[in-house]
Curated annotation (Swiss-Prot):
It catalyses: L-histidinol phosphate + 2-oxoglutarate = 3-(imidazol-4-yl)-2-oxopropyl phosphate + L-glutamate. The gene is hisC. CDD domains: AAT_like. The modification N6-(pyridoxal phosphate)lysine is found at residue 220. It comes from the Bacteria. PANTHER family: HISTIDINOL-PHOSPHATE AMINOTRANSFERASE, HISTIDINOL-PHOSPHATE AMINOTRANSFERASE-RELATED. Pathway: Amino-acid biosynthesis; L-histidine biosynthesis; L-histidine from 5-phospho-alpha-D-ribose 1-diphosphate: step 7/9. Homodimer. It comes from Xylella fastidiosa (strain Temecula1 / ATCC 700964). The keyword Transferase applies. This is Histidinol-phosphate aminotransferase. InterPro entries: Aminotransferase_I/II_large, HisP_aminotrans, PyrdxlP-dep_Trfase, PyrdxlP-dep_Trfase_major, PyrdxlP-dep_Trfase_small. It is an enzyme of class 2 (transferase).
């Protein structure tokens, strides 16, 4: 191993660096035509009409792994497939952070699972708030670097585009963080909404920064949220460690099959068209919302959603709810006491949302 690889593995908990994990029946490379090694049923379930569900699934299906690597621009051995990005977050925290010792750094207001996983691991949580100014929310890069160095954080989570605020971090700023924290922390960039963004993916930076980790998912742009397929893209040696910490059979066969179909050339073509439509609708919706008298601010977004501040967020939420429109209440989040997050829907759905909010304006106070 080279010095860089040693540095990456040095960030893993010492007792897990040589941890063998569980050796499942499917993890052993064997061939044969009569499989009696996993105590599976010799008969299919009556509900299994195609008789394909009685065997345990591949832990990391090679075909899907190759398809995801091609999609994200990396090598198959740099991809760990898991149950959504949530599993990747949890695996990283458990593999890297010693309880009560190794901090996790987050940038609120932000996706809550980073903090949840840190708390479950009893890892100290360092919070560096996003800055809200005339241009919108943005990451405070100098403060992130200072806090990470001072606290000796082992994991730095950067959500880009950020949920719920919609801001993406420029690649140059992420590279500055990577350069400064080399050898001391894994820098995890969550690109769950990357397909909707003008900012390119950071995956190519992995060639220069082995302590970079990227999270991707099929839940958003690819419309496969129920399939629960997420990817951790990282140094191959780190991926191998995370795999040994993962459950033996994390990926149900039906989910793998749907994911493979969803990544076909034809499906990817449709996805690209829908992403373009969502981006266009996002800007239409943003402009229309900004014209409503009860709206204080509509933030620019690189995701498939908009963060909106209201004069009376409770009234807006309740009016939408009464009309059958459910949006995400963000008022409990730091800095967002008056904000709702609105997912960009179809043109018809967005028009319906706007109609309800316009009706609020028409009602006398």
């Amino acid at each position: 191993m080279n010095a860089q690889t040693h540095t990456v593995l040095d960030l893993v908990r010492q007792e897990l660096r040589s941890f063998a994990g569980y050796s499942s029946a499917r993890s052993v490379a064997l061939t044969g035509d009569l499989w009696l090694n996993a105590n599976e049923s010799a008969w299919p379930n009556p509900a299994d009409s195609h008789a394909t569900m009685r065997r345990y699934p591949e832990p990391q299906p090679p075909k899907l792994r190759q398809m995801l690597a091609a999609l994200y621009g990396c090598l198959p051995e740099q991809v760990l497939i898991g149950r959504g990005s949530d599993e990747g977050i949890d695996l990283l925290v458990r593999a890297v952070c010693e309880p009560r010792r190794d901090p996790v750094l987050v940038t609120p207001p932000v996706f809550g699972m980073y903090a949840v996983s840190a708390q479950l691991q009893n890892a100290p949580l360092i919070q560096v708030p996003l800055v809200d100014d005339a241009a919108g929310f943005h990451a405070d890069v100098p403060a992130i670097i200072t806090a990470a160095q001072t606290s000796r954080a082992k994991l730095v989570f950067l959500c880009s585009p950020s949920n719920p605020v919609g801001a993406a971090i420029p690649l140059q700023q992420i590279e500055t963080i990577l350069q400064t924290l080399a050898g001391t922390a894994l820098v995890v960039v969550d690109e769950a909404y990357g397909e909707f963004s003008d900012v390119p993916s950071v995956v190519p930076l992995l060639a220069r920064y082995p302590h970079l980790v990227v999270l991707r998912t099929l839940s958003k742009a690819h419309a496969l949220a129920a399939v629960r397929i997420g990817s951790v893209i990282a140094d191959a040696h780190l991926v191998a460690v995370l795999r040994r910490c993962q459950a033996p059979y994390p990926l149900p066969t039906p989910c793998v099959s749907l994911a493979e179909q969803g990544l076909s050339a034809a499906a990817l073509h449709v996805t690209a068209q829908r992403v373009a439509e969502i981006r266009a609708e996002r800007e239409r919706l943003r402009a229309a919302l900004a014209c409503l008298s009860g709206v204080r601010r509509v933030y620019p977004s690189q995701g498939n959603f908009l963060l909106v501040r209201f004069d009376d967020a409770e009234a807006a939420f309740q009016a939408l709810y009464a009309a059958g429109v459910v949006v995400r209440d963000q008022r409990a989040a730091p800095q967002l006491h008056d904000a709702l997050r609105l997912t960009v829907g179809t043109p018809e759905q967005n028009t319906r949302l706007l109609a309800v909010l316009r009706d609020i304006q028409a009602v006398p106070a």
